[in-house]
Amino acid sequence: MLLKIKRVPTVVSNYQKDETVEEGGCGRNCLSKCCINGARLPLYTCKNLDKSVGENTESPVTFLESLVIGEWEDRFQRGLFRYDVTACETKVIPGKYGFIAQLNEGRHLKKRPTEFRVDKVLQPFDGNKFNFTKVGQEELLFQFKASTNDDDSEIQFLASMPLDADNSPSVVAINVSPIEYGHVLLIPRVLDCLPQRIDHKSLLLALQMAAEADNPYFRLGYNSLGAFATINHLHFQAYYLAMQFPIEKASSLKITTTNNGVKISKLLNYPVRGLLVEGGNTIKDLADTVSDASVCLQNNNIPFNILISDSGKRIFLLPQCYAEKQALGEVSSTLLDTQVNPAVWEMSGHMVLKRKEDYEGASEEKAWRLLAEVSLSEERFREVNTMIFDAIGFSSHEEEEEEELEEQNSMNGGSFTIVHCPSVKEEAVSN
């Protein structure tokens, strides 16, 4: 059953206020030096998670349902969002894959415009442009960090702790232009003003948050520059949606398993070509493998998206080329007219549509066509995979494996074994 909350009037968010500086602070109660002195937030310290990401442990439900959702609803009641996302229509598109469509006209009309080049994945942080130090402190929910004590097996929650400017905290904030219920941002080391680029510590923190939430319906996503990130300040997005994403149901073919137990597979029969990375002896093993691959993509100016799924147990790494095709005039006017920017949620099968006509006419064929335009070609995907496997220190024998499979396919009457990896129980999907 989907959660429902009361609709309230929307007021201007601090994201939208002007930036006129006033004596004694800028007047916006922001995170910059002008206002941060004396700022306090709750602090959530999760237990030490240096364990196998496949290990089942009991996590407290208060993290997601009481803290994230409770604080998010509080900000909703205070009118800090640009529109009421709970009033947006959502449906599952009929068909084999179960693409999810949402009509979100407010996000199109009121979302902050992109303020950087879309043809470069790595760009320096620019403090003159919008960044998260300019948000109002009321949009922040809490500080989040992982324990560094190997013996810590319990969470620690402090209701009010100073924001330590000398040791830049990681914070969770509302997304004032939400896509779904409980849509938040994880902003690693917010005061360090890091540009939107993956690093090992930040990706590990995102996996720790997913593991701590311990709910398959709470997912984190990352968009690089050039893959429809709109703010060049390091952040991950997360929200709660109580249904399975199409990408989570996709079949996969194992390419290799690393020495530390991380399994890397490629997606099959899905419109976007991508990699599924899972397992590992510890959560850090998984984070390091995906970080190495992501850094490789960044350094080679290849835009990409990341979906952290199944409570941090599975990560989908999805290189894309839609912005490049747009710039080259290779995208059809029909797709351009929809004004859909295929970021991580759309790549995963949650289609955020901005026009009622597109929502009413949504079909599996149209969703597939859009995502197929986003995907790298098979040839380019092979090239990118070679780069990735070189970066993580492994050779991809994908071509040889495929030739063997084709041979087995012809010998066995046209069948071979692939891996089907649903992330949540089927009975839960039907709700």
Curated annotation (Swiss-Prot):
Tissue expression as described in the entry: Expressed in leaves, stems, roots, flowers and siliques.
UniProt pathway: Cofactor biosynthesis; L-ascorbate biosynthesis via GDP-alpha-D-mannose pathway; L-ascorbate from GDP-alpha-D-mannose: step 2/5
Annotated GO biological process: L-ascorbic acid biosynthetic process; response to jasmonic acid; response to ozone
Biased composition (Acidic residues): 398-407
Catalytic activity: GDP-beta-L-galactose + phosphate = beta-L-galactose 1-phosphate + GDP + H(+)
Keyword Hydrolase attached: yes
Chief subcellular location: cytoplasm
Effect of disrupting the coding gene: No visible phenotype and slightly decreased ascorbate levels; due to the partial redundancy with VTC2. Vtc2 and vtc5 double mutants show growth arrest immediately upon germination and are not viable.
UniProt keyword rRNA processing present: no
Subcellular localization: Cytoplasm; Nucleus
Enzyme class: transferase
Region listing for Disordered, in residue ranges: 398-417
Alphabetical UniProt keywords: Ascorbate biosynthesis, Cytoplasm, Guanine-nucleotide releasing factor, Hydrolase, Nucleotide-binding, Nucleotidyltransferase, Nucleus, Transferase
Any one GO cellular component localisation term in the record: cytoplasm
Residues annotated as the enzyme's active site: H235
A single GO molecular function term of this UniProt record: GDP-D-glucose phosphorylase activity
Family, as annotated: Belongs to the GDPGP1 family.
Quaternary state and interactors: Interacts with TLP1.
Function: Catalyzes a reaction of the Smirnoff-Wheeler pathway, the major route to ascorbate biosynthesis in plants. Acts as a phosphorylase rather than as a transferase. Uses preferentially GDP-L-galactose and GDP-D-glucose as substrates. Lower activity with GDP-L-fucose, very low activity with GDP-D-mannose, and no activity with UDP-D-glucose, UDP-D-galactose or ADP-D-glucose. Highly specific for inorganic phosphate as the guanylyl acceptor.
The protein's name: GDP-L-galactose phosphorylase 2
Species of origin: Arabidopsis thaliana (Mouse-ear cress)
